Amino acid sequence: MSARRPQRKWASRACSLVIAACVLAPCMPERAQAAPRVAPPAGFAQFARACAPNVDPQTLAALIRTESSFNPFAIGVVGARLARQPASLAEAQATTRALAARGISYSVGLAQVNERNFAKYGLDESTMFEPCRNLRAGGAILTECFARSSGTGRPAQAALQAALSCYYSGNFTTGFSSGYVSRVIASARSNAREGGVEPIPLARDEPPPAR
């Protein structure tokens, strides 16, 4: 989820982490209770390729839909919930300053990057809500998790699902038991359904009309 409000325009790859439509943080804040989940904004794929080129845009879209519902100002609080989500950058920054002053851990932005990871991934108070920087940090976390999970001999899709669990919890199991991995997969299906053209279904066989 710069002192200037980020534009909502979504402005090769070393590896591609892909969730098949048919079918990352050491702390676990409440997922940001943003507005109802919506389809990826127009141009998100191009934006994702520019900001997090190591992760397939479809995978990122599913992750971001689950984490923040594409709200760049979303805030998730560890062990608690906000009464509502911020409606502006200024409100988001005021909220995170208040949380930090009380020693409360939180995650922010599109990819819900936890504040304990800011230094490692190049974020700070002035940049944590910039969509591209936030997405780049989230992509880096997921890529690191995937490198760890794929090194265990898992098949590619199993390794990706384990990486999603790692993104959520820092390990390869909690994301499954909590239902997080299933929610990301469901988001991938919803994105594919809402972003593409629905196929024509098969017609039912009906008896010929009586003559």
What spans do the regions from the language model cover?
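Bacterial N-terminal signal peptides that target proteins for export
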Residues: 4-18
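Second-shell loop/turn segments in exported
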Residues: 34-35, 46-51, 78-83, 99, ...
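Export/targeting segments at the very N-terminus of extracytoplasmic proteins
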Residues: 11-12, 24-98
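Alpha-helical segment that forms one wall of the substrate-binding/catalytic cleft
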Residues: 89-157
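Acidic helix/loop microenvironments that form the catalytic cleft of cell-wall polysaccharide enzymes
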Residues: 64-68, 112-117, 141, 152-179
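Soluble non-cytosolic domains of exported or imported proteins
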Residues: 38-42, 50-58, 86, 104, ...
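Proline-rich, low-complexity linker regions of envelope-associated factors in Gram-negative bacteria
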Residues: 34-43, 48, 192-211
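Surface-exposed patches in mature extracellular/periplasmic domains of secreted proteins
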Residues: 57-62, 73-75, 150-164, 196
